[in-house]
């Protein structure tokens, strides 16, 4: 018997506006989220697909089944879009997902018949959701279910980034998050060694997003061991998609806030 996700059920019965100006997406390894400006969160559901191919089309921040991802998006959104509407889609893309992630994500999003597909670095989207001053260097740690990223933003642009394939799904809920804490500290230290501006960003404090930010013990351990403020973003699990939606509203007037899915990305270290 197949379990029914309550969020998906609510999304199916939620009314949609007649016009569809745009949709923000966050394609995570564990959860997929969509947000429409002026309408709010459309759904927050498990990243799963059905039919041929893997059950989980995205694994540890990598799209391993593009057709499956497309089917998932069509199942969740396709039949709900206005027949004559072609949405502008913006994707919160992992900074170190590279060209491959953006290209595969854009291909999958074509299932929605978009007028255009744009991407924005997930860390930038998180900062937007938090309403953070981007005029100063900022460290963002995004702790997901299977991947953790630490990103240094300077003037709102990605200056350096690190990734490790570990997340909250790799540890027991009742166990201390030592593995994740050690990974974040190692990544912050590596960026600090390479980029001098990291020191100022660390004094300012780390912005914490993703499901890991919902664990107070993780915030406490990072604050204690880094000797720096660590601030969870409000509703951290939806921060990336909310920030992408905020940027979506200014794309028409200021297209530089998001880049085409074929654009360059920082090189992984």
Region spans (language model):
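Internal active-site segments that recognize and position negatively charged phosphoryl groups
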Residues: 139, 147-148
